[in-house]
Amino acid sequence: MNNLVRSNFQDHPFHLVSPSLWPLYTSISLLVLTSNAALAMHNFANGHYSVYLGLILVISSMSFWFRDVITEGSFLGDHTLAVQKGLNLGVILFIVSEALFFMAIFWAFFHSALTPTVELGGQWPPIGIEPINPFELPLLNTVILLSSGATVTYAHHSIIGRNREGALYGSVATVLLAIVFTGFQGVEYSVSSFTISDGAFGTCFYFGTGFHGLHVIIGTIFLLVALWRIFAYHLTDNHHLGFEAGILYWHFVDVVWLFLYISIYYWGS
């Protein structure tokens, strides 16, 4: 329903969402993914293949849901100014909730680090733990992630300035840097001398950096969708709400990584 037709039926600017299967489909997909991941971690038979099934379901549900939202905003005219304000507020509240989640992780880390118990050997890092050198791969990853923040900002300013080519180049550079960051994070995990089961240090380290890595992957998906929409001429200098939400989320990921690097990698080692 376009704006002209809508004006004949409703006297408010808000988007009344049609019934959709995707929230239920996404919930079931996430349940399948998390349940199968737990089974795989406990070495159940074919558990890893079940995780792949869960990933396929989650990716498909996200794709279908993104398709509908893009159609509503770009072609049906459902994203009025009032709707955009509501979506912006929703993104901000979502990021605040994510910040509180990471605050709990930092709380757990500093609780153990500032008052190490007898079980930890009365010191931090605990006896037997060889922490990762913060000036090697973690420092390189910090430079890579901060560089991605600069490139995504360049892409944002480019699209505002109607420089489509600059927006494309900036977005491509950001996605590539994000993929490199994720790959290096995997390399770091593979060469680490401790695991998530190695006491409070291992748990806090992998819980914090692992969930941050998950957020990097989610942010990369958001930016990939925005990149495709720039390529498909969906976004303009005054209509790029999804891109702005992805950029705001990406800057949040940058800030969280700085706190992780300073607290866990540098101070915690």
Curated annotation (Swiss-Prot):
Gene3D superfamilies linked to this entry = 1.10.287.70, Cytochrome c oxidase, subunit III, four-helix bundle (1.20.120.80)
InterPro entries cross-referenced by the UniProt entry: Cyt_c/ubiquinol_Oxase_su3 (IPR024791), Cyt_c_oxase_su3_dom (IPR033945), Cyt_c_oxidase-like_su3 (IPR000298), Cyt_c_oxidase_su3-like_sf (IPR035973), Cyt_c_oxidase_su3_a-hlx (IPR013833)
SUPFAM superfamilies for this protein: Cytochrome c oxidase subunit III-like
Q: Name one GO molecular function term.
A: cytochrome-c oxidase activity
| Subcellular localization(s) per the UniProt record | Mitochondrion inner membrane
What keywords is this UniProt entry annotated with?
Membrane, Mitochondrion, Mitochondrion inner membrane, Translocase, Transmembrane, Transmembrane helix
Q: What is its EC number?
A: 7.1.1.9
Gene Ontology cellular-component annotations: mitochondrial inner membrane
Q: Which cysteines are joined by disulfide bonds?
A: none
| Major subcellular location class | mitochondrion
Q: Subunit comment for this entry?
A: Component of the cytochrome c oxidase (complex IV, CIV), a multisubunit enzyme composed of a catalytic core of 3 subunits and several supernumerary subunits. The complex exists as a monomer or a dimer and forms supercomplexes (SCs) in the inner mitochondrial membrane with ubiquinol-cytochrome c oxidoreductase (cytochrome b-c1 complex, complex III, CIII).
Give the family per the record: Belongs to the cytochrome c oxidase subunit 3 family.
Its name, as the record gives it, is Cytochrome c oxidase subunit 3
- Native species of this protein? Pyricularia grisea (Crabgrass-specific blast fungus)
Q: What is the lineage of its organism?
A: Eukaryota, Fungi, Dikarya, Ascomycota, Pezizomycotina
